Amino acid sequence: MTNTTSNEIKQLDSDYIAQTYGRFNLVLSHGKGCQVWDFEGNEYLDFTSGIGVNSLGWTDEDWLKAVVHQASSLAHTSNLFFTEPSSRLAKKLAEVSGLKRVFFANSGAEANEGAIKTARKYSHDKYGKDRATVLTLVNSFHGRTISTLSATGQEVFHQHFFPFTKGFDHTPANELRALETRLGQKDVCAIILEVVQGEGGVCSLDHEYLQGVQALCHQYDVLLIIDEVQTGIGRTGTMFAYQQFGLTPDIITLAKGLGGGLPIGAFVLGEKVQDTLGKSDHGSTFGANPVSCAGANAVLAKIDDTFLAEVKRKGEKLQKALAALPKVKSVSGLGLMIGVEFEEGTKAADIVAKCIEKGVLFLTAKTKLRLLPPLIINDEQIEKGIAVLKEVLEA
């Protein structure tokens, strides 16, 4: 395999992998910190972190040590046995969230599915079967399974896959009156929302709206589920984004940055629903995988108050620098989860392609440029990324 060329890998992909991804024209070989290299030895500064997954960058030494040690001793057991990594990880997640119990899955979509099941069972146990609707927000994204796609509030994803799962409805973001009117129908068991809508264009919800949502949830005994798949684990400058808005969710969902590069998802249950799921109500063969949990424990061990303060500082620095660039109309987001809207005529996808040619990797979200750098990115790397972006925008 060491003599394989980029073109050979691309051809194998074309021949044998389902063509569901619009890939960058790069074949990556290895990475370290905030840099990655392709098969030809070209170096790139990474502002994508695997779409917010590599929170500690590429091949962090402590993370790698924990993962290799666990893989060499106990890689998989199923959930018929107790394991140390999952137990310790669950305790840590309960402590940092203020919630009570954790169910481990393998992805954000799985975590959201589990949260939805929990909400419906809670409502069924308390009110009966006619109170099962889950509300989500217009412009939201919650996954690509049939149920989480049904929950997603973007028509662009609602093509070709009919019929969708019943029991979901969408309400406009930042419109409390519309939400209260919908809750008045008395058929809703939960609302699930992202504090910052990532795939929807890095759009932050209003503080007043979020406070109002929480109050309405209390009034109608509707569960508040916060999707922290992209915003969680330090991405926004606090461990979880909801902590910046004075919210107390009943359930949060996690994935992406939790594993530091390995697949893992989780939903964390608050006191009201901590005992809702009983034996055989939910399950996952690969959930709580010891290796993934060991990686997640290594990630959480590094995210302390000092680390989070640096994420916030670097995010503010990056947003300020981005706002000063030519052709930039607006900058949105929290911490190191940032969206850049360009003036009319400047396409984010074109900017990303030109930046790749100059050795810097960015993402898009709808029509915006999206930045999700490793949380360990330093000031010099931020300045380099801004310089390249400025050069491209001025060309």
What is the role of each PLM region?
Residues 2-395:
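Conserved N-terminal phosphate-binding loop of PLP-dependent enzymes in the Aspartate aminotransferase
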